[in-house]
Amino acid sequence: AATRDHPHAGMQISPDQGQLLALLVKLIGAGRTIEVGTFTGYSALTVALALPDDGRLLACDVSDDYTRVGRPFWQQAGVAHKIELVLAPALQTLDARLATGAAGTFDFAFIDADKVNYDGYYERCLALLRSGGLIAFDNTLWGGAVARPAQTDDTAALQGLNDKLHHDERIDLAMLTVGDGLSLARKR
């Protein structure tokens, strides 16, 4: 209810997306995961619940106010020990992980943050993922706006990302009509 009743609840993933993310994490046997854009913590909670007890989620966000909503629920669900919340620009956080030699050590990433940086998040998460790892992108249909001439920078960024993913030979791709569009990219 805390997320559902939040003034910006529309930014949160849908319950069916949460169920799908949890299933994907389990299907690939993920142990180390990344989330770019935590908002009120619902997607972090669903991923953390799907992880084994020694699994870890690196949650990247810039808002203490938004993430503060979800932190008590992580505690109540018994998964707070799995979640490392880093409050800083995600590109900076991901670059820092790459600089410490973490390339190829993560299994799963979920990207749901500022759309204009999706390409940067993609490149860094792809570098951090192992072969066979999976990246899930939220909002890739963008209310259907990606099928029309771009009216905003966000729409243009998502159109560019969708085109890039479609032609990227480093991945296998599926775009699902779950929520506002959920694209799945498996690193080859």
What are these regions (language model features)?
Residues A1-Q12:
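Rossmann-like AdoMet
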Residues M11, P15-R188:
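S-adenosylmethionine/decaboxylated-SAM
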